[in-house]
A protein has these predicted regions:
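Fungal secretory targeting signals
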Residues: 1-19
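Eukaryote-skewed repeat-based solenoidal scaffolds used as protein-protein interaction platforms
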Residues: 134-155
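N-terminal extracellular ligand-recognition/capping segment immediately after the signal peptide
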Residues: 32-43, 49-76, 80-85
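Detector for repetitive beta-architecture
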Residues: 26, 52-54, 65, 74, ...
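Right-handed parallel beta-helix/beta-solenoid
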Residues: 13-40
């Protein structure tokens, strides 16, 4: 029984890992990187490959509205974090300020618009900073979205 408890504690520690560097083959976003905005990394994705694609985002606040179009394969977006089990440790935020005062529908107000299936988002805070007075959403998902894990939505 002690071995089982020790094994479980090792697994839980391993699951609460940091994500400080981009996995091999990832599109990396951040100052001094090939892509300085998330939207530019998304634009560089292949919409014909069925292989998994990955975007890794360095720490920072990214003031942009991000649209993920329909892709042929899975996409994972991973933000920099020192502890991937706590959203309070996330160091990446995407923020925009659209609302139905400026856009004709909910989808167009979203800070993150996802139109592809098999999409995963890890350790990224998504915020619509419009405020009060009109409908404004943080995330709009128009396809089969897989896990959105350890993140916060702020409107």
């Amino acid at each position: 029984m002690k071995l089982l408890a020790l094994g479980l504690s090792i697994v839980s520690v391993a699951l609460a890992a940091s994500r400080k560097s981009a996995p091999k083959g990832a599109f990396t976003v951040g100052k001094g990187q090939k892509f300085e905005t998330i939207s530019k990394a998304v634009a560089a994705l292949s919409n014909t490959t069925t292989a998994e694609q990955l975007i890794f985002i360095q720490p920072g606040t990214y003031a942009e509205q991000v649209f993920i179009p329909k892709l042929s394969g899975p996409l994972t977006v991973q933000g920099y974090t020192t502890d991937d089990s706590k959203y309070s440790k996330n160091q990446v935020t995407i923020v925009a300020s659209e609302s139905q005062k400026t856009q004709p529908g909910n989808d167009l107000t979203a800070t993150l618009r996802v139109w592809t299936s098999d999409f995963k988002l890890y350790n990224v805070n998504v915020r619509n900073a419009f405020g009060e007075g009109s409908q404004a959403v943080a995330v709009s998902a128009n396809a089969g979205v897989s896990p959105l894990r350890v993140f916060s939505l702020l409107t």
